[in-house]
UniProtKB/Swiss-Prot annotation:
Superkingdom: Bacteria
Chief location bin: cytoplasm
Compartment(s) of residence: Cytoplasm
Residues annotated as site: Transition state stabilizer: H182, R243
Name used for this protein in its record: Acetate kinase
Gene3D superfamilies reported in the protein's UniProt record: 3.30.420.40
Function comment: Catalyzes the formation of acetyl phosphate from acetate and ATP. Can also catalyze the reverse reaction.
Residues that bind ATP: K17, H210, L211, G212, N213, G214, D285, C286, R287, G333, I334, G335, E336, N337
Cited PANTHER family: ACETATE KINASE
Organism per entry: Cronobacter sakazakii (strain ATCC BAA-894)
Amino acid sequence: MSSKLVLVLNCGSSSLKFAIIDALNGDEYLSGLAECFHLPEARIKWKMDGGKHEAALGAGAAHSEALNFIVNTILAQKPELSAQLTAIGHRIVHGGEKYTSSVVIDETVIQGIKDSASFAPLHNPAHLIGIAEALKSFPHLADKNVAVFDTAFHQTMPEESYLYALPYKLYKEHGIRRYGAHGTSHFYVTQEAAKMLNKPVEEVNIITCHLGNGGSVSAIRNGKCVDTSMGLTPLEGLVMGTRSGDIDPAIVFHLHDALGMSVDDINKLLTKESGLLGLTEVTSDCRYVEDNYATKEDAKRAMDVYCHRLAKYIGSYTALMEGRLDAVVFTGGIGENAAMVRELSLGKLGVLGFEVDHERNLAARFGKSGFINKEGTTLAMVIPTNEELVIAQDACRLTA
């Protein structure tokens, strides 16, 4: 066990993901999820020393109770882990324009996260709770807490990519622009893709597809992000588990005027009741859609719309590659495991030279990386993401 252990925290509105990772070699000593906050069934699950464990946190428990359990119950069994913690890394969904890289957390950074909360109202307030609780639980690491922003990797986008065609003062005065998300994942797979392509990162031209319950595509030119599908918020872009992605903005007015829906109703519809859930009217789970594609109309409908949208983004981002696309990369829970999504999406892009090898595609699942294209065709690859490792490495580097 090295002396570069980092506690990685990812606080959501109703959950907390945590891990202790060796920032030098990526070894994971603890990982877990506390979930169902504020509900009677609040619970925590974790993996340590090869064993799986679960416990109730108590009715109504939230971030404070979860971190208390991690410190006083889980880590109490392994005091050597606590003793060797050198830093705490926090995933922060939105850093606005202010943060282009990870930073050590101080009062100014906390204020910056608050200032960006209107763009991530479910996530940023939860991150602030996580930071406050971590400072309480680990006072000896007070100056070793690091914020790693999901938006930072996308701050290299040029103005023509991040501006909306709205009155310019809305950007200048209120920061309304494209920010993107999943930046930590897009960054990680870009680094890994460069290794697989045997190229320096700064020479890599790829399109990265992070597909999970949320999903986004990024255009990476010369190793830097030049466009991404998520926008001001994570609602824009691809079809997602429960999010609509791109729609005609006038649908919002129609829902209000013709159906009498309130702003809150429409927000809930677009963020929690749309996407795969809306199209199937049954579930947001891509596994259902894949398993039932050949036999159920709802599954086929959802999969076809999902892959059509994804193929459109890959195709359009090819135009930003300045004449050379090295590869398309799939990552995230769906990107890494849903072979059908990859095959159907790339099957629409034969004009760009894509041809999926069925056997290679099936082999690149369940944590395995690899190329999935037929020999001699445009490269496509699967790379399992590791956002926690990036967060641990940044936290270690900035607090050394």
